[in-house]
């Protein structure tokens, strides 16, 4: 019994994304260096997750490995470089993160290595350091050539990164605000009558038992410096 996909990994990606809204076409590339051959393809869809798969000598590496590290690192570098060149990222702006750049990406990286090394018995993670270098080299050369000739596709990819970065920054601000509020709030049950001053060296807190005592203390306190 033979399993055959006429379009190779391009067809594989099309099949994975067949029920999704495409943002780009499937982009494929290939190359070879130092006896290691690299074949890759990717497509962006209108989703907020990434799906990047790695294979070495037709073995699926469920935990990824150095070939995926090379791809991800180089791809992020390329997109940030173009984003600055196109003035989409200003001088004051931080670079997109790797997850930003891969937002909505489905990708497959397949290499052929003459002497593959894996972590563990199950071959779920590739461990060859030269694989990262070769994949990065091929990705850098081939995708730079592609994006130079396909500006609209490049802008669509950068648009996905911008959207992810905006969401990430919004979530970070919300988390920071929540932590800041928790830092300055000691009231866990709604019964703290806080003082107005934020200078801890001048403030004091009184702990009283019962609502009656609490009410009297609140009336008599100095609101500027005394909390009940």
Name each model feature, range by range.
Residues 1-228:
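GHKL-family ATPase ATP-binding module
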């Amino acid at each position: 019994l033979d399993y055959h996909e006429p379009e190779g990994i391009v067809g594989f990606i099309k099949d994975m994304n067949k029920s999704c809204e495409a943002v780009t076409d499937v982009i494929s590339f290939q190359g070879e260096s130092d006896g290691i051959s690299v074949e890759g393809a990717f497509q962006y869809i209108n989703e907020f997750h990434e799906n990047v798969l790695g294979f070495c000598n037709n073995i699926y590496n469920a935990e990824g490995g150095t070939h995926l590290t090379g791809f991800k690192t180089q791809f992020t570098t390329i997109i940030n470089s173009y984003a600055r060149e196109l003035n989409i990222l200003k001088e004051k702006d931080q670079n997109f993160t790797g997850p930003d750049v891969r937002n909505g990406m489905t990708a497959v990286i397949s290499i052929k290595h003459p002497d593959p090394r894996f972590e563990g018995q199950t071959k779920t993670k590739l461990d060859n350091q030269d694989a990262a270098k070769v994949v990065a080299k091929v990705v850098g050369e081939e995708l730079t050539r592609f994006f130079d000739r396909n500006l609209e596709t490049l802008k669509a990819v950068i648009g996905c990164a911008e959207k992810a970065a905006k969401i990430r920054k919004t979530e970070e601000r919300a988390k920071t605000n929540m932590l800041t509020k928790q830092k300055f709030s000691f009231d866990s049950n709604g019964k703290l009558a806080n003082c107005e001053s934020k200078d801890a060296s001048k403030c004091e807190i009184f702990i009283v038992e019962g609502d009656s005592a609490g009410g009297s203390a609140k009336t008599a306190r100095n609101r500027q410096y005394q909390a009940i």
